[in-house]
């Protein structure tokens, strides 16, 4: 909220969007080589992932900023999916650092931001 307040102080007429956090951890009960977690640890990791996304959404709401729901946008593209938008534990040279988004995720987020701004 303090970051949004700082932006509002400097640019009172700005339209402020808070970009959310993506789905990283699979919803299923199994992990994969790219996300080497024990099956028993997946629910906790999922809770942390959801918590980060929820915290950004709630922070945007409290600050009266718009929220870009990247969590919903990236559903089905977690690290263990057939079409991951986030790199796993290994850096993919020329594409993404470990646990960072691929270009497909960034493109989807950019398109969603444009959609919101045009509304």
What are these regions, as identified by a protein language model?
Residues 22-119:
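Catalytic His-Asp segment of secreted/periplasmic serine-dependent ester chemistry enzymes
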